[in-house]
Amino acid sequence: NLRCSLTGDGMERRIYLSDYTWTEDDYIPGQIKFIMSAPEKMGKASVRFYLNDGYTAPEEVEEEAVDTKSELYCTMIERSLMNLGNTYRIRKAIEKARAGKEVTLAYIGGSITQGAGATPINTECYAYKSYQLFKSRFAMRDNVKFVKAGVGGTPSELGMLRFDRDVLRDGEKPDIVVVEFAVNDDCYESLVRKILKLDWNPAVVLLFSVFANDWNLQDRLSPVGRLYDLPMVSIKDTVVEQFTKKPNEGRVLTKNQFFYDMFHPS
C-alpha cells in the first residue's frame, strides 16, 4: 500500500509511482482511500493521474446522467426481482396501510442497510428511500413507521441478537422485514425463521447486494429464500450486466456511477 499524509489546504500533493518498489501484484493501481483525522469528518478531494512523456491514455468517455424515467432503466430494475415468492404477507401489510392502520417497515443488515456510501446517510440510504416510496403509495395518513437496524461489518449471527434489541425495541411489531447481510454464516436461516415465526406473521424480503468485483452471496443464501418461498431482490442481477456495456449498447449506468467504494453503492 502507498500511503501519504495530506494537509487539506487545497495544495496539490504529487505522488511519483516510480519512487516506490512494486511487486508483481501491484501492476494495476487499485482502490484510493481517504482516512480522515476523526470519525464523521468529511472533505472534498480531486484525484488526477499524470502520464510520463511518451505515454498516452484512451480518450475519456463522458458519463451521461442516469435517466431513472427511461424504458431502459425500468427494464434494468425489473431484473432485480430474483424470486417473487409468496406475497400473501406483503399484501396483508399493504391492505393494512391502505386501511389507515399502523404498519411498520423494518430493515436489518450490515453497512449497506446502515447507509454507507449514501449522503446524507439517514435519508439517502436504500432503506429510507424504499420506506418513503411505500408510504407514498400505500399510506392513508402518517401510519407507516420506519425501523432501520443496519450495523457495518456484522454477520447474521449478531443479527439474531440485534433483531430483538434494535428491531423489536419499544414493542415494535414490524409487518415487513428486509434482510440484507453480505456475510455468509450458519445463522442466516435461523434469523429468517425467527422472523417468520413471530406471532403477528411479518413478511420477509431478502436483499442481496453486490461488491465492485461483481460478487455476492446470493448463490449460497438464495436457497434459504426458495425453501421458505420468500421474495428475493438481487442488486447483482440488476446492475452487473450494465458495467460492460458501451453507451451505444443500451447502457443505463456505469460502475463508477453505481459504486461509492469497493463495497457500497452511492
Question: Which positions does each model-derived feature cover?
Answer:
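N-terminal secretory targeting modules
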Residues: 1-108, 113-121, 132, 136-143, ...
